[in-house]
Regions:
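Alpha/beta-hydrolase active-site loop
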Residues: 93-120, 131-132, 338-361, 365, ...
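Loop/turn elements at helix/coil->beta-strand transitions in domains of secreted/extracellular proteins
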Residues: 49-54, 83-87, 114-119, 139-145, ...
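A domain-start/cap signature at the N-terminus of enzymes
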Residues: 18-53, 83-86, 91-94, 100-104, ...
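Alpha/beta-hydrolase
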Residues: 56-58, 149, 302, 396, ...
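Short substrate-entry loop that stabilizes the transition state in hydrolases
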Residues: 48-51, 56-97, 287-342, 402-403, ...
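The feature captures the conserved acid-bearing segment of alpha/beta-hydrolase catalytic domains
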Residues: 139-197, 392, 397-510, 524
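Sec-dependent signal peptide recognition
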Residues: 2-10
């Protein structure tokens, strides 16, 4: 796990540097005030993932005391604390805003903040700078949302990636027009929305003179909380990136489970020896009491190495899928931490058993598992070790590593031996999602595919499922995968510049028992649209609770 550990250390260093801004190189001189609210360790609330960053451009230059007072006037402290957010108050470089100079200053602060959820607020002349210098340029593709108050309108750019915007105050109707145009938005109720990307929205409030606290409350509730914008293209997001280095950032939903009609329960279970166990339950509210027996599927999420145990719920996309399709989700602290005990494979099974016994509406024939990185490695192993528990398993950015493993991870030889013993007697659907630009758990090329962790995982599932095992690859057959996959498909998304997924299956007879999804030029993280792809695959399968045989329901 050396490479995974190295990546996590890099992420922790990056997070720590961000959270302890005073230890980094000096702030650009025009940053007059900085505040962070990075609170690790609490079980309640949300995780630190995709914490918002606010850039506030005031009407005119402020000193530090006035800048702090401005932040207080917005009355945003509760939002900052609840979301681990940071705020920068950024003066014009000169006495007044100069679009060219202040655009360069914006890039300098952007590079330092390394945010994957940047909200930009402009007031008066600061709003005019935002409207005329940031929104019409490629900066729009780096910003998750804009709040513009009392500014003058910008111009409609010839081409734009768009940016969500809340427009209010003087000239609001005029200021909104370029935002509506660049977002290709049409009026839908009380907002303007891009028909192909609902997160590209514009909200127009023509109220003049409203208190800043009232304005911020509305902007947060109606726009800012809806989405994030981060970049995992051609690198991994926690490594950081400079402005413009990897193109436009991808718009994704900012997970707020309550808005999806989902209630979260936090469960701590004391152990006879050692630390308690921790897990998070996510319930579609109507299913908590009124669902028939054995009617609700179970989706188990497993976080990556040393990640917060809310990571997958908040970043994988599965809560959004559950919001639409109404199934139960549980994310477990499977790995353990300083406060909670490690579950391991047996503990994961025990928690599932506890849930099935406690909630008769849960369906024991439809229990699925997905993980990220080390969680993917664990989900992959669970499908072999605990094949009688799950109807299907899968993961993002992790397979089966060759060589000896330590701690909670099984070795390739051990998993291969068990797969061999079960060959032909046990069938387990497996969905493997990977990023081709992942340097933490790398995808293979024609020069290094032997022993690659993804190919190891596919081979091991081929072995257990009684399928032909593909050990030699031919990249003339398929330039990306080097092997012939059935039902090959290219899915072009509206994320970034059109991030695409390449997919295909390994069949056993009529059953598509292995699905492979390569997110092209993507780094080591969840690609949220892939959650729906995985779920659509999972729901083809169930497992008879008595015989433990796999049931294929067809596509």
């Amino acid at each position: 796990m050396k490479r995974i550990t190295t990546a996590i250390v890099a992420m922790v260093i990056a997070i720590s540097a961000f959270a302890q801004g005073w230890q980094m190189p000096p702030m650009p001189e025009n940053v007059v005030y900085f505040e962070h609210n990075f609170n690790l360790g609490q079980v309640e609330g949300r995780s630190y993932n995709h914490a918002p960053t606010f850039f506030i451009y005031p009407d005119s230059r402020l000193d530090e005391a006035a800048a702090k007072a401005l932040v207080e006037e917005f009355d945003m402290k509760d939002v900052l604390v609840a979301n681990h957010a940071a705020v920068f108050v950024i003066n014009p470089v000169g006495e007044k805003y100069d679009n060219a100079a202040d655009f360069e200053a914006f890039k300098a602060v952007f590079d330092r903040a390394r945010s994957g959820n940047l909200k930009v607020v402009g007031i008066g002349n600061g709003a005019t700078f935002v409207n005329t210098a940031l929104a019409p340029t490629d900066a729009a593709g780096h910003i998750a949302g804009i709040l513009t108050i009392d500014g003058k309108p910008g111009k409609i750019p010839a081409q734009s990636w768009g940016v969500p915007a809340y427009v209010t105050g003087k000239n609001a109707a005029k200021v909104a027009k370029p935002y509506i145009a660049m977002n290709k938005a049409v009026q839908t109720g009380d907002r303007y929305v891009n028909e192909e990307e609902e997160l590209l929205a514009v909200v127009v409030d023509t109220t003049v003179g409203a208190a800043l606290a009232e304005v911020f409350d509305k902007a947060w509730a109606e726009l800012f909380v809806k989405n994030l914008r981060f970049n995992n293209y051609k690198h991994t997001h926690y490594e950081g990136a400079k402005y413009g280095q990897y193109g436009p950032y991808e718009l994704e939903p900012y997970t707020v489970h309550e808005a999806l009609g989902i209630k979260r329960e936090i469960v701590k279970l004391e152990q006879y020896n050692g630390l308690p166990w921790l897990w998070y339950e996510y319930w579609p509210e109507e299913l908590m009491t009124d669902a028939p027996a054995a009617s609700v599927p179970v989706m188990v999420l497993l976080h990556g190495n040393t990640n917060d145990p809310r990571t997958q719920a908040e970043t994988s996309g599965f809560i959004q899928v559950a919001g639409k399709e109404r199934f139960f989700v549980v994310e477990m602290e499977w790995q353990g931490s300083k406060d909670f005990g490690a579950m391991g494979y047996d503990g994961v099974e025990q928690v599932i058993g506890i849930l099935l016994a406690k909630y008769p509406q849960l369906d024991p024939s439809r229990v699925y598992a997905q993980g990220l990185s080390a969680g993917s490695i664990t989900a992959t192993a669970l499908g072999i070790r605990k094949s009688y528990v799950f109807a299907a398993v899968g993961g993002n950015c992790g397979g089966i590593f060759s060589g000896a493993r330590r701690g909670l991870f099984s070795s390739y030889d051990s998993l291969w031996a068990e797969a061999t013993q079960k060959r032909g007697a046990v069938e387990m659907p497996y969905c493997s999602i990977l990023g081709t630009a992942d340097l933490v758990v790398p995808f293979y090329t024609k020069d290094n595919y032997k022993g690659n962790s993804f190919l190891n995982a596919w081979n091991t599932y081929q072995q257990m499922n009684g399928m032909d095992v593909t050990t030699e690859l031919d990249f003339a057959t398929d330039a990306l995968f080097g092997l012939e996959l059935a039902d090959r498909q290219t899915i072009v998304t509206n994320k970034g510049e059109g991030i695409r997924m390449e997919t295909g299956y390994f069949y056993k007879g009529e059953k598509p028992l292995i699905k492979v999804v390569a997110v092209v030029d993507y780094g080591h993280w969840n690609f949220m649209p892939a959650a729906q792809v995985m779920w659509d695959y999972f729901k083809m399968f169930s497992r008879d609770p008595q015989t433990k045989k796999l049931i294929y329901h067809g596509k």
